[in-house]
């Protein structure tokens, strides 16, 4: 069953950056139901596998949390190997009837790797070490790329400033920003 546009809880920006052997992942806090903001301080970032990984989610909240739980199971099964766990989750996502109906995306970072698991079950590893998902993702991505290219800011600062830029532009992104680092 597809979520109707009015009943879908959506609207977020999650961005992760790798720089100098460190990773940061951050998100805004806005949750929207249809055209109404229902919460300003939603936590969309989770620390995983004994604090070695960070995961953020966008999309239908219940769907995203289901995927996050499945991803954690895969991490445990594959001893924290990020890429292997992501590929196995994507494989399940594509073949399982129930999972295929989930409308969510995950952005995952470690100190060495940044991945997106898309809503179609694809695993994407961006070449520039920047992952961005959600309604304000393209604004945050553009800001992060410019900051990576033209400043010496560390990963957490880039994430923070990129989210501020997205919040200034995207109506579904607010400035209640949470950034975590590994």
From Swiss-Prot:
SUPFAM superfamilies in the cross-refs: N-terminal nucleophile aminohydrolases (Ntn hydrolases)
NCBIfam families for this protein: ATP_dep_HslV, PRK05456.1
Family designation: Belongs to the peptidase T1B family. HslV subfamily.
Keyword Secreted listed: no
Keywords noted in UniProt: Allosteric enzyme, Cytoplasm, Hydrolase, Metal-binding, Protease, Sodium, Threonine protease
Any one cellular-component term (Gene Ontology): HslUV protease complex
Keyword check for Cytoplasm: yes
Lineage, opening ranks: Bacteria, Pseudomonadati, Chlorobiota, Chlorobiia, Chlorobiales
Residues that, per the record, bind Na(+): 167, 170, 173
HAMAP family named among the record's database cross-references: HslV
Role this protein plays: Protease subunit of a proteasome-like degradation complex believed to be a general protein degrading machinery.
PANTHER family, alphabetized: ATP-DEPENDENT PROTEASE SUBUNIT HSLV, METALLOPROTEASE TLDD
GO-annotated biological processes: proteolysis involved in protein catabolic process
The reaction(s) this protein catalyses: ATP-dependent cleavage of peptide bonds with broad specificity
InterPro entries named among the record's database cross-references: ATP-dep_Prtase_HsIV_su, Ntn_hydrolases_N, Proteasome_sua/b, Proteasome_suB-type
Subunit description: A double ring-shaped homohexamer of HslV is capped on each side by a ring-shaped HslU homohexamer. The assembly of the HslU/HslV complex is dependent on binding of ATP.
EC number, UniProt record: 3.4.25.2
One Pfam entry name: Proteasome
Regulation: Allosterically activated by HslU binding.
Gene source species: Chlorobium phaeovibrioides (strain DSM 265 / 1930) (Prosthecochloris vibrioformis (strain DSM 265))
Gene behind this protein: hslV
Compartments (UniProt record): Cytoplasm
Active site: 12
Protein's UniProt name: ATP-dependent protease subunit HslV
Example GO molecular function: threonine-type endopeptidase activity
